[in-house]
Amino acid sequence: MNLRRTLLLFSFIFAGSLAIAQPKDRWTIQDDGAIRWNINDNIPHDDHLEMSGQQLSVVLRYGVDAQKRFHLNRSLVFPMLRMHPNKTQNNLKQRFDVNIPALVTVDDQTLLNEEVRDVTFNGIMRVESSFGYIYRRKELKDAVQLTRVLYPSTNAARYCEEYTFKNSSPNQITLRVPEWNVTYTTPEEAGVYGAYCIEAGLSKSGVFVLKPGETLEFYAVFSGRKLV
């Protein structure tokens, strides 16, 4: 009898330890078929995914740190732009580790204390987060909402990121977006089809005044092409 009780107690303890050790699912399936990562205390966490069009593939290495800030590194692959020696794996490649929202200022200040709310994926990636800024010597939390939408072009050698900033504060704000353009050129002798050009830039720059509830949208575009 004592042996039976001991075995029964052990089985309960063993089953309980398995339940505790088993990690919770980070992603949940939505009604529309998308998967959603609702950011909670299960951070920091890093992950990656690959998306492709006809002329470009992109690997996104992304994550949310312990302070709920989003980070992103992009690896672009251009399969139609071949490099010497002419083998399958020798395509034009380039990484970009730039933080686009960090280029934008609100009332001449850096956006503060990003908090990612959720990440969704249904063929394209969507990231929802919020920032604060200093107003009259105090931080206004959740004052600027940001939506990132990340995807490759289906038929061009181009990868796009949409950025939509919304003024969620009770005050008028001024956003400044810089002119940002980057160009890389490969040596002519390195490419099967000669020299190649990789370009990245913002679709919009300038000073933008947003009243409460108003939005500003612009794109970051990364592309590759032959120079000839």
Language model: regions and residue ranges:
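Terminal accessory carbohydrate-recognition/targeting modules of carbohydrate-active enzymes
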Residues: 21-228
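Bacterial Sec-dependent N-terminal signal peptides
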Residues: 1-23
